[in-house]
Amino acid sequence: MTKWIVPACYLALAIAPAAAADVRLDSYRNPKNENFRIFNHMYLDGVRGGMMAYNAWLTHHGGQPSFCMPGNLALTTEQTEEIMLKSADKRGAKGDMLVASLLLWGMQDTFPCEKPASQ
């Protein structure tokens, strides 16, 4: 029985941080204090960076990118936030909606890719 306790504890500890890794729209719009507001901006920057890196990886490996941002454009945190919040408004998003999903949809709305001629 004791051989299962350590793996169970490890699993519980490994899963716990993953549940807290998402930021929801309500907590983004209404941070508890200035530190949470700063954290939200850092989180949004990280999500944007991850999406851009994944998009570049997809393109490099012959896949269809999720959005087609101009190559010479560098988005600021404020611009990224505006894209995400417009996406939330467009979709009538509720407070429990994930900020990352809203940003992805907003990037697709703001920087659509041209469809291939065959479609």
Give residue ranges: language-model regions:
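Bacterial N-terminal signal peptides
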Residues: 7-14
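Short, compact, well-ordered microdomains
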Residues: 82-118
